[in-house]
Amino acid sequence: YLLQLSLKYLKSESIFTDSHREHRYQELIQLAQDYLEVLQLQGYMVWEDVYAEIEDFPYKLAKNLCFEKLCIPRQYHPEYVRLLLKNMLEPCYGAGREKVRVYSFCNYLEFAMYVMEEAKGPRIFKREELADRLGISSYKLDQILQDVAMDAELVNVDFSYYLDATTSWKKPFVRLDTDTYFCLDGRMEGYAFYEVMFQIIYAKRGSVFSKHQGKLLEQMVYRMFREKHFPYITGEYRQDGDLPERDCDMILEGNERVMFVELKKCPLPGSYEQANDVDVLSALGAGMLYAQEQILWHKLRLKEKGVLALYDKEGNHIQDYTPGKKPVIAMSICMPEYDFLTDRMMTETFLESILRVTYHAIDPSQEKKLDKLNKRTENIRMVTARLFDGMKYTTRDVFYNSLFRSLQQVWTMLRVCDTLDVFLDMCATQLVMITGAGDVYVDIWNALQLKG
């Protein structure tokens, strides 16, 4: 909250002495801590999450949305941003006369990486420094700066209350004058390089570009696993009676367990930072829940047919797959960060609620936004009933072995795992480990420590 306010009133020079400035900073921080205490958004006991009732999920969701906006800046590793730029956007940028800007994509990538690596905390960049270090021609550099910088007076112009909309996430640079640019932090602002270039290409290529993003995402994830030499299976199976045709994005089979993985690009809505829980639930239905529904169809096909007969896009038979008696983990992956929503307890509570409740908006004008979510819950209940075929089951029987992760979280795990079995073990550990941190990166760290 204080960082966003500071960006709104950013000045090139301070009017205070160092000692006076430090004193005022401490006062501000204390006021912010007191404000957080008064709002009563923060829990201090891990058991609050463990024993949370499903009926309380909407309240828990709203409270966490507010806490996230107030306290937690979203961060992306520079190398992950590079991965997104190279794999998701460069193929659509064009070359020669077909490129969407006068500068090359290589120019843009070099610029972005330099800024992210240099801005380890608040950093002023001079145009002269960028020209000297990067060796980009003056005309091309000016266009890059025009694209990635927002004038200081336009940053967070309508932001006062902590749930007000911000604009700082749209551009990585704040333009203080024609030669001076400010970056808050390379990890906090790095994803804006992706946002900027996405909008540039979209303005030129339109819906053809955006529709191609899902396929590029799949190819990027497959490449990530191939580079680690982790084997995977992918394909699609055909309609068989009343069992529908489905894509099977990824199957990971280790010595002791199997994981079904489904990928979605689905971003959080812009109203997320304003704690619009209706829009967030709608996005969860379109992304995470849709992926879990697909995985339930995989399980049903295996139960009723005993095998997944997989084909490629050209209709060629790849293989007949069965996991045998190995336990199956389900993981849905979305490309952007989903903050606290990927926390184990949040995922479990939401998925369990799907089998017991429907979601409705207090505001009648917002109700239609939840239609697709509730339709998807109907589908999941139908598939679940058929999967258990008259047997008694609990909500945990259906979704206990389910994870929801951002792609950056999966990328982080891949960086520290030497074999596929180690990766699957780490995922299995996170299914049973509760830290109360609400942060998957803490869970990854703790899983590493448990392995010694």
Question: What is each stretch, according to the model?
Answer:
Residues 226-244:
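A short acidic/basic microdomain associated with nuclease active sites
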Residues 244, 255, 324-325:
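A short, structural micro-pattern
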Residues 216, 220, 245, 290-293:
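Short, well-structured alpha-helical interface segments that form or flank functional binding sites
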Residues 265-326:
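Catalytic cores of nucleic-acid endonucleases
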Residues 1-215, 219-232, 268, 304-452:
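Acidic, metal-dependent phosphodiester-chemistry machinery of nucleic-acid enzymes
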Residues 166-167, 243-245:
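Short solvent-exposed loop/turn micro-motifs enriched in small/polar/acidic residues
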Residues 249:
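Cell-envelope/extracellular polymer assembly enzymes that use nucleotide-activated donors
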Residues 252-260, 265-270:
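Active-site beta-strand-loop-beta-strand hairpin of nuclease catalytic cores
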